[in-house]
Amino acid sequence: MSGTKWTEEQLSAITTRDCNLLVAAAAGSGKTAVLVERIIKIITNEENPIDIDKLLVVTFTSAAAAEMRERIANAISKKLDETPTSKNLQKQLTLLNRSNIMTIHSFCLGVIKNNFHKIDLDPSFRICDQTEGILLKMEIIDELFDDKYDEENQEFIKFIEAFSSYKSDNALKELVLSLYNFTMAGPWPKKWLKDASRDFDIKTLQELDETKWVNVLKESIKIELDGYIKMMQKAVKLINETDGLEPYFEGFSSELDLIVNAYNNVESSLNDLYNSLNLITFNRLKTIKKNTVSDENIQNLVKQIRDQVKKKISALIEGTFIASPDKMLDNIIKSYPYINQLTELTSEFIDRFTAKKKEKNILDFNDLEHLCLKILIEENEENQIVPSTIAQKFKDYFEEVLVDEYQDSNNVQEAIIELVSRKNSDNPNVFMVGDVKQSIYKFRQAKPELFIDKYNSYSLDKGINRKIQLYKNFRSREEIINGVNYIFKSVMSKTVGELEYTDVEALNLGANYPEKKNDDDIIGGPIEVHILDRSDNKEENDEFKLQAEEEIGDVNLEARIIVKRINELISKKEGNKFKVLDKDTGEYRDLKYKDIVILLRATKNWSEVLLDELGLAGIPVYADTGSGYFESIEIRTIMSLLKVIDNPMQDVPMLSLLISPIIGLSAEELSDIRLIDKEKYFYENIIKISKEKLISVELQEKCEYILSSIDKWRRKSIYMPIDEFIWYLYMDTAYYGYVGAMPNGVLRQANLKILFQRARQFSDTSFKGLFNFINFINKLTKSSGDMGSAKILGENEDVIRIMSIHKSKGLEFPVVFLAGCGKNFNLMDLNNKILYHEELGLGPEYINLENRTSITTLPKEAIKKRMKLETLSEEMRVLYVAFTRAKEKLIITGAVRNAEKSIEKWINSAVLDKDVVLPYEISKGKSYLDWIGMALCKHKDGEILRKKLGFSSEMCKDDLSMWKISIWNKYELDMYDELDENQEEEDVKISILDKDVNKEIKSEVYRRLGYEYEFKESTKLTSNISVSDLKKRNIEDDIDTLKMFDLEEEDNKNKDIITPKFLQEEKGISAAERGTAIHFAMKKIDFSKVGTLKEIKEQLNKLYDEELILQEEYNSINPYKILSFFKSSLGKKMLYVYNEGGKVYREVPFYTEISSLEIDESLPQKYANEKIRLQGIIDCFFKCDDEIILLDYKTDYVENEEEFKDKYKNQLSYYSEAIFKMTGKKVDKKYLYSFYLEKEILI
């Protein structure tokens, strides 16, 4: 660290002492390095060193705390290398193990453990997991409502009638739980509830005028009227500058005066404001004769501006003043009993939940902060809340309190920091570092206002409260820096963004990117914006385009643009290659897939499509989703199965089950079942069909099978623990094997394992049974507890990552695609019946029980307006985070319904001010693309936007940023992408046919149904079969291997159910599992580090550390065997190809067609044209000395080498055929490598 060249501002942040110091550290400014160096300087100060355990360092995550410790340890160790006799350094390295570098929750837990007696807590308490916490809440909320019903309290009954649905009170229970979670983010939840209720206890208009709600409404109205005034002023200016528009001047000026008058009355009483707004009228414009106006475009523009203002003022009055002030007051008064009931229910829930946790001697994460707070405060003689003696000890002990990611703190955490530090004393000692422009956790109740208040009040000069700004970015190229500054100077403001983005906040270039050495190379370049126009081209409406419109969704089309640019960036042609800077060598190199990330605001509904489209194009890709687990097809299918077993009288899950591979009915069969009796449930109709031959014998037999299966599963569910029952279903239905054979099968099976593990956690609680488990999962699905898919990828895999912007925070990538920018912001929460806000309290609808009508209230409208601005501000910061992830290239994509209309809207917003887009216009934006488009309409590179509507370049402003804007018609994009025969990526994903895979297990299920018809021989054939199964001589051998799944032999099957690794006790893994583990290792291993046993062991350790292989799998892999392969002549040949820059293709999936007679020669000749889809995964192939060499790894026990060769001969033939279809080149040599024999075998 001592060799680092610090900037002047960084040095100030490192060395400034004896004050509260706020460091505003922009993206890429070296925040963490500065924080670590400050700590090092403090503990190694020659004159007054401070022990590291006397510092409290609060981090946002445990991972950040661990990284901080590691960095400090490395820094101390380096200093020890320089001065090995330093006793202080040796002492600090020792003290580091007990240092207070931790999350706020860890700190609170330590305070509680050391002071449990102060709060009457049993010291043997434990922290409950999420599962147990959710189940307890469900139990308590049910008990609470049951008790309230028993009391027959009329106010409660009216509350239920007003806010529950006709069928249940679940929505109201959810409301109480949601409000509980919200209030627990504040320091005094029960006080907040009391205050929120008391706010509704008003009687007069004067009292209403003094409320926070009215102030917020006035602020909002002021912003809107200011926008309308500027719009009308712009129109009047254009009228004055344009010959022939003089007749408009008087009317426009008069209307402008009325709006100004209303603006001036904003600070008056609600009644006066209401009246002044209603005085605004728009009379008929005077007529202008044709051909008398010098510029008709200007005439149309001013009329459009006036029409917009007219509509918006009408909407403002109707939306804000939903009634007269008197009537709004009346609605508030009538809503008071409802609000009182809600707050009392929530408060009682808090008490009951607290009592239940005390009874069980458990705490949850909310308790950690609140109990810590309870320990740190006490009442003095004047009944004032003051720091306790324990808090005072912390104040005296900690020499400095350092808070990382301060922009994400909430009010509880702020209170705790104040109580254990000397922040409010004459000897302050708090260091806070963060970037408010990256505060994107408001959904976790983060309070960026805490940072903003200090940023606005702290001084740059000397004083006890100081701030230092770090705005030099050491991450990104100049093109990225300039682009970020241009966009956010244009659109970020105090109104939307909660911070003005001025030259002070702008990023400054700090990274040093060298010039390119080869003129043909491509580096950096302008930021790209690709706009997909979804409108129809009426002049071109042929059959091909209609088909494209029907078959390709908007997300797919946007994905095609991304695929096209990726293929262009990672070009297979010589010359003109896109290069990125290698951070290790300092030289430019070819772009790799792992250098690219695709960022999404939310991955749901997008990541699957992107995976499919990139996969079809042969681009290796992985989606790192933070959610969507419960939306995956395999989890939805199993949950539908569980719901049907619990209660078959549910049509939605029943339908999902019937069409799933578990049952596999056709659309026609489903229709036949439904038409038996449309008024009955599917289950009832299935019963009816099973008893009578109403359709066909086949359907009757299927219905009998469905009923017998459901009956069997229901009986099993009664006595089996839920986790064992779920695994039983996986095996009994063969669904676990089925999803493993689907695309992304490893991930799908991992997802099913997660569900099993979740069921095991559930079994460890006091709640039992299928019904409770389904309810628990439903709660998780509705809450923010969606867990994201299983992790199956290492960080160094050469694949493109797809992730949410939130997941990307703190990361950086050479090339960033920011996709889905045309998607509308999610403002659905603003439509809830009751809104709540930390400052403004509760905002309900008023429900009139007499006529069953609802109407919004003034509190709700006030909260709605504030929440909308806060949500948009959060979105602005999320966009900033996305932009600043890019190091060298940023590519933005987004779709609009109609490009011309969108551009017209952007230009109309942009023309109102030369330098920025007005905050009012930004607040009306519905997507990131709206904001970006408004800004780019004013940029010199936005000519393509202005030209589309005939606008001149006079509105342009000079700027250093460079942009390349493209507008795509949806018909320009090819429907299908062909695989290039010279494709260079290592992990090729090929789909010769479609990707719909039905496996042999499904065929076996149908076989057991006992069909008897003309082509019954073909029932032995699957529509798909894997190559590994073709090593059998005929299909009957395959059927024997599937006996373990026999649905009719229930008793025997229980003995044969495969027990997963995580259910086994003291047992090793199977030979097949061992083989899978070795194959996985051979796919993941880095060929550049296989020269020694140590290197191979290190790579296997890494796979285990990254949780890519389980403990049992890790133990089963013999590193000596892998080293032996690389020492063999075949292994050396492969390494030679790799080291010379050739491509070694590993784990290549494929699908192709073969004749059914190749599967079973005994079939009649009439099946010669019957095709079977063949799928498999080729272990490895590569080109060496103009020969294509195929290699297949085997881990079998080998007794006879010739029999071993004969066993796999056909399998390698199919692989060879697949390689020919992919590359157009024949395989010259086919090898088996036996890890058992440690020998290569030529076939």
Curated annotation (Swiss-Prot):
Superkingdom: Bacteria
Domain UvrD-like helicase ATP-binding, first and last residues per copy: 4-477
GO biological process: double-strand break repair via homologous recombination
PROSITE patterns per record: UVRD_HELICASE_ATP_BIND (PS51198), UVRD_HELICASE_CTER (PS51217)
Keywords: ATP-binding, DNA damage, DNA repair, DNA-binding, Exonuclease, Helicase, Hydrolase, Isomerase, Nuclease, Nucleotide-binding
Binding site for ATP: A25, A26, A27, G28, S29, G30, K31, T32
Function comment: The heterodimer acts as both an ATP-dependent DNA helicase and an ATP-dependent, dual-direction single-stranded exonuclease. Recognizes the chi site generating a DNA molecule suitable for the initiation of homologous recombination. The AddA nuclease domain is required for chi fragment generation; this subunit has the helicase and 3' -> 5' nuclease activities.
Protein name: ATP-dependent helicase/nuclease subunit A
Lineage: Bacteria, Bacillati, Bacillota, Clostridia, Eubacteriales
